Amino acid sequence: MRILLSNDDGVHAPGIQTLAKALREFADVQVVAPDRNRSGASNSLTLESSLRTFTFENGDIAVQMGTPTDCVYLGVNALMRPRPDIVVSGINAGPNLGDDVIYSGTVAAAMEGRHLGFPALAVSLDGHKHYDTAAAVTCSILRALCKEPLRTGRILNINVPDLPLDQIKGIRVTRCGTRHPADQVIPQQDPRGNTLYWIGPPGGKCDAGPGTDFAAVDDGYVSITPLHVDLTAHSAQDVVSDWLNSVGVGTQW
């Protein structure tokens, strides 16, 4: 199995390095990751400037000023030959649950892999300690995919409790929960008296009941949520069409 491995925490982050070491026990792994932390970069792509890369002695590649999406795009289309069989993103330092997936560079890297036609996993740890647990879970899933490919055409967003492996209760297939809208901005002043702004923490849990990714991780289970690239709200198409007909928009200007 050939794996393109990326993340949003940066090429030196403990999550990606722990996972790369574990995956190399049974797979051909190419790391292509940002040269610095790009958390929250979502699906952004660098279009107004060129991208430079740096290759370390162990073969890992850092994309200077690159986003997670840049890294996967370059990895698939230029840097990994032959091309990968699968794209894996992570292990992220901290969870990507509920609407976190909208902002997550970890999920975005996997989404770019899927958009380019490859199976893709996004892996996050609900904490900053037991990366070995998340690595073991990921390796188990990838070995299973080698034996029996999962033909859903979906991204698997995997969130792992920050627990020792022997305390993980199992796996639950889940849906994304939701958070309350975030509204905190933290102002500060620089030495010249100019106001600086920091984006505050995410909103608290809103929909975190049974069946959600939040609930699974809180209960000690690995959460696997299938995600897809198509953002169309299919169930709303008829509602929007009926509304347009009702208000006359499009029939007269």
Curated annotation (Swiss-Prot):
State the InterPro entries in the record.
Answer: SurE, SurE-like_Pase/nucleotidase, SurE-like_sf
Pfam families the record matches: SurE
Q: Name one GO cellular component term.
A: cytoplasm
Q: What cofactor(s) does the depicted protein rely on?
A: a divalent metal cation
User: Where does it localize?
Assistant: Cytoplasm
Q: How is the cofactor bound?
A: Binds 1 divalent metal cation per subunit.
Q: Which UniProt keywords apply?
A: Cytoplasm, Hydrolase, Metal-binding, Nucleotide-binding
Is the Cytoplasm keyword given for this protein?
yes
Known EC number:
3.1.3.5, 3.1.3.6, 3.6.1.11
Q: Report the coiled-coil segments.
A: none
Source domain of life is Bacteria
Report the family membership.
Belongs to the SurE nucleotidase family.
**Any idea what this protein is called?**
5'/3'-nucleotidase SurE
Give the organism the record lists.
Answer: Escherichia coli O127:H6 (strain E2348/69 / EPEC)
